[in-house]
Amino acid sequence: MPQVETDDATLYVEVDGTGEPVTVVAHGLTNNRNELAAFTPFVSGTHVRFDFRGHGRSSAPETGFAFVDFARDLDAVATAYGATRAIGTSLGAGAIASLLARAPDRFERTVWLMPAGLDGPFPFKDRYDAMAAELEGKTAEEALEAILFAPERAAEYLRMPWKREVDRLLWDHDHPDGVARAVRGVIRDWPVPDREMLRGVTSPVLLICVEGDEIHPAELGRILHGLMPASHLLVYPSEGSLFAGLPELVQRVNAFLLGDDEAADDLG
């Protein structure tokens, strides 16, 4: 079983693809390595998908769930596999930001999908504290059942029946208590101490956002775009338009990671 050991965590890793470039793929909070697994086969090179601490099949230390800790996970996996590119969703994007704020040249190119935080307090703590409390003390099977049969998800599953199976994959965690600790740690922290630190990131960055997402506001993407001189911003008008445009988006991301900045021409 492929693993990367850090000072305080054992990180589970899966690799697909071959050759260059090598891209490390970092998932969002409460998700796991499966998050983008359906799309990485359409991206050139080698893709290193891993579970952050507390998530999936990785270990769940008692402490160490700040953004700098998730950035250490990202850096450790990238170093172990020689990754020169990184893709991160939400928490994963925050981990990239945290790492680049301290080491601006760490990656040659990065993709930030649905960034959720920068240098200020998270505005939805109560909602996520309730989620953490729901997970705490449950077995893996009990936690998965609680998510799949949560009343607030019923309407969503009626609209999009396929979403239940996606959630079944993404909420596959060995340590629900670890996920709860991760949630509590992240919502009480922020990716960078000062947004101005990101002005030092001169490598190409592709930012992908959706209008109307309160957790991952498109305005944050615009702020990040203004901070990083070599960044490109894609803003989709709705979640539906993002899903409808996924084949084209995957092609854009692939071209961008291969060095084609024109593939990242702004949508918004």
What are these regions (language model features)?
Residues 230-268:
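Catalytic active-site module of serine/aspartate enzymes centered on a nucleophile-bearing elbow/loop
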Residues 7-59:
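Conserved HGGG/HGGXW glycine-rich cap/lid loop of the alpha/beta-hydrolase fold
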Residues 201, 207-209:
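Short beta-strand/loop motif that positions the catalytic acidic residue
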Residues 214-220:
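Conserved alpha/beta-hydrolase "acid-adjacent" motif
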Residues 97, 101-137:
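Flexible "cap/lid" loop of the alpha/beta hydrolase fold
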Residues 122, 138-184, 188, 197:
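Conserved alpha/beta-hydrolase catalytic His-Asp/Glu region
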Residues 49-87, 251:
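Active-site loop/oxyanion-hole signature of alpha/beta-hydrolase fold enzymes
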Residues 88-96:
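Gly/Ala-rich beta-loop-alpha elbow adjacent to hydrolase catalytic centers
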